[in-house]
Regions:
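Active-site C-terminal subdomain of aminotransferase-like
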Residues: 149
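A short, well-structured juxtamembrane/interface segment
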Residues: 1-12
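Glycine-rich phosphate-binding loops that contact phosphosugars or nucleotide phosphates
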Residues: 11-132, 136-145
Length: 149
């Protein structure tokens, strides 16, 4: 897959914001900010109350990563619709499936999640693929930047 569009958007962005819809997604957004921060101003926003702040302050030269498990949460879909109207470049990060969130984003990244039954505790879905994805994205972006120099 060619990630040039995403790399160009990040390179030209004034700010890159990350927003996770749940606790695991918020941890992924926080880790994304940590590893990318030396190269770009990354802002990690979390909590439903912060979505209103994003909507008010977003600019056309912002890139926003919207990290969601299913991509079907009404909150995330409404947020994407509103941010899209403001002209920001949106990238969804969801599990591999056709989903509503991806429809409102300029580009999408997908993970293949693993479900496990954990005794009597029910199903468990690993967040590890999200962390692998953002780390690979970071490495690829560093290589792309090195080639451009």
């Amino acid at each position: 897959r060619d990630y040039t569009k995403i790399f160009d958007a990040i390179y030209h962005a004034k700010r890159v914001l990350t927003y996770g819809s749940g606790s695991s997604q918020t941890r992924v957004a926080s880790e994304m900010k940590r590893i990318f921060l030396p190269h770009k101003l990354f802002i990690n926003l979390h909590g439903h109350d912060m979505s209103q702040a994003i909507e008010k302050k977003v600019q056309q030269d912002d890139v926003i990563f919207l990290i969601s498990l299913s991509g079907e949460s009404d909150h995330m879909i409404d947020l994407a619709k509103n941010l899209r109207m403001k002209g920001a470049f949106l990238i969804s990060v969801t599990r591999m499936s056709s989903n509503q969130l991806a429809l409102y984003c300029n580009d999408s990244l997908y993970i293949e999640s693993t479900h496990m039954k954990v005794g009597d505790y029910g199903d468990y879905e690993s967040a590890t693929p999200y962390f692998i994805l953002i780390e690979l994205l970071y490495i690829a972006l560093c290589f792309a930047a090195a080639i451009a120099i």
